[in-house]
Structures are given as structure tokens and as C-alpha cells.
């Protein structure tokens, strides 16, 4: 029986290294460690490694094989282990794993007390280079914003809208997804809820009216909360307000430090 050729392991003569090569958008079921225990969800993974100039190709099947071997609950410690194992398995000096997924949180309506789920977009990234490891987290939190100028100049009412506040951070110690959500929702004109009754709708409408925020206010207030958390080394806060009186969004961005 003839041996099957291993083309990707052959030598490449163009002398060009590749910064990242691997697989993108692998859908895979995962179990997350959360503040309340665990949560099952479906993630999209991007897994890449550095490829030296002399090597023609990476071993694509090994990325999927690695995930098939691991069913442990995912947290930052497990992401570190996965990233290190991937780099070793692909015989590389650097690699990155990004795991993106919907995260669900049970929320209680402010008046009726009725419970419902709200979803948030989350990405966890682990990166290793020459033995040094770092991780980051990105969370998109939908909230309500109400315009202070509209409130000030109008005899009644004020324009309000849904906003997406996105926090990307690096930290020395693990920061929970729920903690990031709380930092943002506390600073919004009002939180969002999956299910509201009429008394709840009255409450959130009035709460937003009494707590107006420009897009500038939103990013500054969230940034102030994040700076106070000494576990957090660096962050980016973005807010996009989907303006109800315009066909464009208002946008603000703060990077720290």
C-alpha cells in the first residue's frame, strides 16, 4: 500500500510566514461557567496559529480534533489550557482561540416580578505567543437611552431608543460576564427586559425619562465604573444609539489607558 502524501508538511519556498492560519466560525456546543453555576450554549470558534515561512500548510483537522477531545466547562482557566494545547499540537510558537456565543441571563421585571431571559453577545479570546499568555473578553449589552436635550426642550416626552454598549477588556484576574453586564446596565437610562407587564412598562418609561443620557454620558459613566475595578488592566467602551428621530446612529468610544 502506497503512503499517502502529506502535502501541508512539505517545504514552502516563498519565504513568507503567516501570522494566523486555521479555522473560522466552527459552530460547537459549549458549557460555560457562570455566577449561578453553568450554562449550555452554542459557540462560534476561530482557532489560528502562526505558520513559519518554510512550512507549506498547517494541519487543519487538528483544530477540530482538539475541540472534540474537550468537554470541560469553559472558563478563562480552561481557555488558557486549550490555547496552550493547540499551540503545542500544531507545533507553533503562537496561537489564538476566540469563542463567541449568546449568553442568557434571567431577569426580573421591576414591578410585576415576572421572570424572563435576555440575551447578550459575548466573545472570549485566549492568545499565546512565545510562551506568554493573555486573555480578553468582549460583551455587548443592549440598553435604553433617552436624550437629555430632547427632554429639556420638549413640553412633554423625549426621544429614546435602544442602544448597544460594547465593553472589551483585559484583566489580571477573572471578571465575570455578569459583572460587566451590571456595570453597563447600572449606567443606562434604563435596562431592557425580555418580558414586561403594563405596570413594568410604565416603570421603565418613567425611569428612562428621569435618567437621560447622551451617548457621551454613557461611555464616560461606564468607563468610570470599569476604572474603579482594579482587576481590569485595559478596556474599550463603545456605545451606539439607534436614534429614533434619525436614520443614523449616535456613537462614542473610549479606550483606556
UniProtKB/Swiss-Prot annotation:
Its EC number is 3.5.4.16. Signal peptide: none annotated. Keywords: Hydrolase. Pathway: Cofactor biosynthesis; 7,8-dihydroneopterin triphosphate biosynthesis; 7,8-dihydroneopterin triphosphate from GTP: step 1/1. Pfam families: GCHY-1. The keyword Endoplasmic reticulum does not apply. GO terms for biological process: tetrahydrofolate biosynthetic process. It is an enzyme of class 3 (hydrolase). The record marks 147 as: May be catalytically important. The keyword Cell division does not apply. Converts GTP to 7,8-dihydroneopterin triphosphate. Belongs to the GTP cyclohydrolase IV family. This is GTP cyclohydrolase FolE2. It comes from Neisseria gonorrhoeae (strain ATCC 700825 / FA 1090). The gene is folE2.
